[in-house]
């Protein structure tokens, strides 16, 4: 048979599914999220032999959120769904990962190539013989597409997709038909690791850009550094920290850049988000005559409703594909090489002192006798409680904005979805992040989610239990969708939710004695819980009902909601 002859010509025959999963293992993936379906079942059989753990999520949307959280800690992740019904259920999560530059390899089990070619009337189709329609839907939210329909190009398509996923830090799509799963291809390619290195900048062009940057930096009287999400996603944090240390410049982060820099350093100044900033932060950033802006994403929620008051004339923007110095843009220049040379050639710069922030309570809370847990009181207290290397996940809503007022210990990772803003995201992301943390010697994973958002994706508590994960989940119980109340419909029924017995939920998911539940209604109760050694040692999944006023929110959320309401009118 022709197939046998072709196989005999291979030096190291390997099945396509094994090749794919071994490549994923090579780039650091150790667990695969997803939901089984008849078009991907045979592929899942290969996971154990490739050293990969099957997570098994409750639905594809949650699996996508979990893959997002896993990738933000691990560097890259993999998601497996089935054709049509499965892949479409995951697309909200994939779109969020695309918008926020999170690398997920989305593998879709597809019908037999013969069935596709013949346009058969199969289940999970639209009944019109079009087997390309769903992949096309993913095309706009994937940075590479690999349709594995021809054996001779499979290895190249897999390698290219994974490499693009890593380098561009965005999702890719791999379609894997049932008959291709077991096809033999050349496994000798696996002896050569994928080249995940960035293409170098043109040396002459890079040197010119560095000289221009240094000219303005040396002339500046009070320059500052502003770090945002793409500095994290495009892996330039080493360069950012070197710049921060070598220059001594006041360094700030945007909300999406929270956790990007070591907040214990003396020149860390806090979160800059326009009018939502601490007044001292706002004054120092907006009065600067040169802002080194690294990886900026100037979205509405990241800027407190587009309230930045910094001009392009005083800004140098560093990005993964270009550098913009004032109004001059230099395309095809990656910021990594430029930042490295700027640090090497910097010399003396004018570094003004920064007002050091702390987790001290604001003046109006210091002498308060109130036992009500307000946002103004909560978030500095959270900062006092957090430990080095914690992973802190905050849901779209009050938590996303409240965390701006928390100064982190060293090496804390922050996860949020400020740009895409899909409520419920954080619960799935917590599962994925906690799994990646478990692979990294049990970093502590802490989630703050609202009671409304929790109801969208609560099933992932079941997945946490199934995978023996021990996050601390704080559920802010404030009777519904607070952020939406501040935008529109304060007392309307559509912003209300059905109250749940939240601390009892793990029992429903089969936890039995593998969890602890708490109900916290006063400041003293929370302070006591934070001082509890057993609680802090995270012996198991812990779920904390955190009861807060219905009408309370961080000031930055109120300002952003007001701006959103104005734009929607």
Curated annotation (Swiss-Prot):
It is an enzyme of class 4 (lyase). One of its GO terms (molecular function) is magnesium ion binding. Its EC number is 4.1.1.1. Thiamine diphosphate binds at residues 398, 421-423, 452-453, 478-483. This is Pyruvate decarboxylase. PANTHER family: PYRUVATE DECARBOXYLASE, PYRUVATE DECARBOXYLASE ISOZYME 1-RELATED. Gene3D superfamilies: 3.40.50.970, TPP-binding domain. The keyword Magnesium applies. GO terms for cellular component: cytosol; nucleus. Pfam families: TPP_enzyme_C, TPP_enzyme_M, TPP_enzyme_N. CDD domains: TPP_PDC_IPDC, TPP_PYR_PDC_IPDC_like. Signal peptide: none annotated. InterPro entries: DHS-like_NAD/FAD-binding_dom, PDC/IPDC-like, THDP-binding, Thiamin_PyroP_enz_cen_dom, Thiamin_PyroP_enz_TPP-bd_dom, TPP_enzyme_TPP-bd, TPP_PDC_IPDC, TPP_PYR_PDC_IPDC-like. It catalyses: a 2-oxocarboxylate + H(+) = an aldehyde + CO2; pyruvate + H(+) = acetaldehyde + CO2. Keywords: Decarboxylase, Lyase, Magnesium, Metal-binding, Thiamine pyrophosphate. Its cofactor is Mg(2+); thiamine diphosphate. Mg(2+) binds at residues 451, 478, 480. Homotetramer. The gene is pdcA. Pyruvate binds at residues 38, 124, 484.
